[in-house]
């Protein structure tokens, strides 16, 4: 079996997938992993074959800034547009059995659609449900906003060229793949009881870390609360 992973080059998107890729390799599954060059060592350490892709977002230092709600869908779609042909050049010659990606890594959606293989979406955070819509804050922006006009044009192009589902703002943030993996405990997910069998909950995926961290737990006997600001506050 051959599975392709397609993830945008950001720690919060790549890191949760690495233990999954490593476990799949241990089970004899061949993994082709597409992301940006800075993640080469981390990916190769899992046993996956690493394929670097171009990132328009990284090269342009894309930052929607205060207008994030308007601009982020176009940023994600443009990122997919910049790398999809590189990915397909490899996968058309070495066809995968499925493509794994997350909501922001829509080149994976396009690759699965173009190759007509299952689309597996991985959720590193809360998936949308009848009681929680990740798209809701983004839907307050009118379709006439220049960033939304750009996003709509890209979505239309992808549907026509790659036969992908129309990647509307709601589809980007509230959509699901053919099969879905949530790296959270089910009891923490609002509306989890509404999902059917194509959504599985693996719990948090913690793999080996190569970082040298000299921080130690304080020995004062007090309860400890850990806050992670993630990639949002660390330039992706």
Model-derived segments and spans:
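Nucleotide-sugar-dependent glycosyltransferase catalytic domains
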Residues: 2, 26-236
